Amino acid sequence: MAGAGGGGCPAGGNDFQWCFSQVKGAIDEDVAEADIISTVEFNYSGDLLATGDKGGRVVIFQREQENKSRPHSRGEYNVYSTFQSHEPEFDYLKSLEIEEKINKIRWLPQQNAAHFLLSTNDKTIKLWKISERDKRAEGYNLKDEDGRLRDPFRITALRVPILKPMDLMVEASPRRIFANAHTYHINSISVNSDHETYLSADDLRINLWHLEITDRSFNIVDIKPANMEELTEVITAAEFHPHQCNVFVYSSSKGTIRLCDMRSSALCDRHSKFFEEPEDPSSRSFFSEIISSISDVKFSHSGRYMMTRDYLSVKVWDLNMESRPVETHQVHEYLRSKLCSLYENDCIFDKFECCWNGSDSAIMTGSYNNFFRMFDRDTRRDVTLEASRESSKPRASLKPRKVCTGGKRRKDEISVDSLDFNKKILHTAWHPVDNVIAVAATNNLYIFQDKIN
């Protein structure tokens, strides 16, 4: 994927360079836990970009309109709305604290002038309406302009209220709250292509909700055994098919993916398809089961493929072939020899996400040291890029990074022993149409775009 010029990636079959566009967030060395970004999501048009953090806040950025005087501005986003989505809670029955951290954000397709999104923490899902107001009503009969009631005996004439222009105000209001349906922590939400329902998944169950109904949901998957000592796997991610409203998939900690069809039965305890790659017995180790756990699953925009991310690799599966993936891309194979120390510092349990580009020809996922990886599915080339303040000059090209595993190290390479495992790219998003990407690095949001000469 990296041509002679450097960090290339497909754009209609041509290589191009990625360049820096923006970085959001403070530069402080001591980052507050609440400021760490926990999810990143473009809306369907790509004009809005939402982030959620561990402090329960949602920040929405709006894309700058491109014009002739600023041809490079299509990768620039400015703050549109900020609101507190979730607050910390306490479950008195179980004596458990419920974090405010936003686990996932999912946009609904836009139906009118307002935008809607779902956000969830470990237990509660909320539907938010994001709307603009640039007019206000004046001239009420019973109230003054400051809201005080007028003396009815002093009202001598009937007034017709009029709308007057005001400064643009963006309001975020909670329209629905979906609660008390999950015993375990919610790890996924996914909006159905019927635009009326969505699913939510925790470790052992998947529920189907209607967007208009908050007091009940349908349990469509339940893998909880009668005896919890017999539990061998948990659900790690779930997603609806982008076009077939009856089909969804869910992945497990054993590295398997099950495709279910809701037309077959109300409770999808029997899958329609079962995707699993046979394990090579010669490479089995103590860590095999941990690193095979799938942390993310994403359908391609076309609906023909799905992508799964485990600890060391990204795999692309054809929905018509269950026996093995059609592509396997190694993300950071050089860490295989470091699994023991990664187990000791708990990094081996990090949950990396993955995403497709708009045409499904390239995929992106994160790594350590603020590195992120891109893979060209057509040419099978790949590139490692870095989200760092050092390369954050306007329109500065990103230079490909290489990790050295041997003894001799070139000047432009970094040794595997000097990687910073506290700097990790877990959450990334790719614009649905353009070559604009958003990369979350701790409390910073980096935005990159393809370079225009």
UniProtKB/Swiss-Prot annotation:
Q: Which InterPro entries match?
A: PP2A_PR55, PP2A_PR55_CS, WD40/YVTN_repeat-like_dom_sf, WD40_repeat_dom_sf, WD40_rpt
Q: List modified residues, type Phosphothreonine.
A: 308
UniProt KW keywords: Cell cycle, Cell division, Cytoplasm, Mitosis, Phosphoprotein, Repeat, WD repeat
Q: Name one GO molecular function term.
A: enzyme-substrate adaptor activity
Name positions with the PTM Phosphotyrosine.
305
Biological function: Substrate-recognition subunit of protein phosphatase 2A (PP2A) that plays a key role in cell cycle by controlling mitosis entry and exit. Involved in chromosome clustering during late mitosis by mediating dephosphorylation of MKI67. The activity of PP2A complexes containing PPP2R2D (PR55-delta) fluctuate during the cell cycle: the activity is high in interphase and low in mitosis.
Q: What is this protein called?
A: Serine/threonine-protein phosphatase 2A 55 kDa regulatory subunit B delta isoform
Q: Which organism is it from?
A: Homo sapiens
